[in-house]
A protein has these predicted regions:
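Structured-RNA-binding interfaces characteristic of tRNA pseudouridine synthases
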Residues: 1-269, 275
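Active-site/acyl-donor-binding loops of N-acyltransferases
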Residues: 239-249, 265-295, 299-351
């Protein structure tokens, strides 16, 4: 059995999202039909990222399994012949049979477009959010500066989210502006991160629309982030303005991962995970952490290390060493005493 990875582009206007559901036509449904027509096999595709009804994609990633011996590159053209015109395969390649698009470290980039003018443009209506009020893009840029880095983004998450935790890392966010021939301006919010919560980008965009139009000050963004309360943020902006631009998968681990914000600061040493040893470990140093975040922080990092191949995680707390004790449970991981610079070791109790 072979596993084929697809880079998929689609106009989401006519679809009820990417994931198969009982009511409504979806991107996944059309891809499944095309794969079955081509291969004669029922092999459901798995998307790396799910998109909602009306949301578009330039570079979503999907995989499917097949016994067909066609060269991987030819699947691009063969599937496109069997897909509607608003869905296109941009590239296809073979990947290891155990490669799973949702279990990889990656960088996702979304773009959100806002058409700002007195009169809507019919040519932009399906791919941008229309805004009548004049928007101050400089205030919008000021507002997003606090969002970069690792934070708890619970305030920008809809209630229907099934996420285990609401901490994400934003690598970069920029707001661009360009003139439109028909008049007005097209504002593009480009945001890259380790992952995004349900409706996260659209709620950030909805909050920025309020800031740009003067309904609330730019300083509100940081207050919203700190409060961690969805009620404080703006509305969910329209789906038509959102496009999943790309998903880039990490080829190798970084030597160190660190994070610093008002609530926590840590450094995670991953060099041993890259060394290819039979028994590999990661080394976590906690410099400071608010009590409300401590349990979740350690649980999340222990699980991240395990997923990246660590047999255990050695940990030290330089702020309050007494917070760690033998037998403490962090999800599936239990602390036991260790020797040396890192006095504690966490191992998965499920194995």
């Amino acid at each position: 059995m072979r596993r084929i990875r697809l880079t998929v582009s689609y106009d989401g206007t006519a679809y009820c999202g990417s994931q198969v559901q009982p009511n409504g036509v979806t991107i996944e449904e059309k891809l499944n039909e095309a794969v079955e027509k081509l291969t004669g096999e029922k092999s459901p595709v798995i998307f790396a990222s799910r998109t909602d009804s009306g949301v578009h994609a330039l570079g979503n990633i999907a995989v499917f399994d097949t016994e067909m011996r066609m060269t991987a590159e030819k699947f691009t053209f063969a599937l496109n012949q069997r897909l509607p015109e608003d869905i296109r395969i941009r590239a296809s390649e073979e990947v290891p049979a155990d490669w799973h698009p949702r279990k990889q470290n990656c960088r996702k980039t979304y773009i959100y477009r806002i058409y700002n003018h007195k009169i809507p443009d019919p040519l932009l209506r399906l791919y941008s959010q229309f805004c009548y009020y004049d928007l101050d893009t400089e205030k919008m840029r000021q507002a997003v500066r606090c969002l970069t880095g690792e934070h708890d983004f619970n305030c920008f998450c809809s209630a229907r989210s099934q996420a285990e935790n609401t901490v994400r890392t934003i690598y970069g966010i920029e707001i661009l502006e360009e003139a439109v021939p028909a008049g007005g301006k097209l504002i593009t919010i480009r945001i890259s991160g380790s992952g995004f919560l349900y409706n996260m980008v659209r709620i950030i965009a909805g909050t920025l629309l309020q800031i740009g139009s003067g309904i609330r000050p730019a300083e509100d963004m940081e207050r919203i982030l700190r409060a961690r309360d969805r009620k404080n943020a703006g509305p969910v902006a329209g789906a038509c303005g959102l496009t999943l631009a790309s998903i880039e998968f990490q080829k190798e681990l970084e030597d160190e991962v660190s994070a610093e914000n008002e609530d926590w600061s840590y450094v995670l040493d991953q060099r041993e995970l890259k060394a290819g040893k039979t028994v590999r470990a990661a080394y976590l140093t906690v410099y400071r952490c608010a009590e409300r975040d401590y349990q979740e922080l350690l649980t999340r990092l222990f699980h991240q290390n395990y997923r990246n191949g660590a047999a255990c995680t050695y940990v030290r707390d330089l702020e309050k060493p007494g917070r760690l004790a033998p037998g403490q449970q962090y999800g599936f991981y239990m602390l036991e005493a260790a020797e040396g610079e890192y006095p504690w070791r966490a191992e998965d109790q499920g194995n």
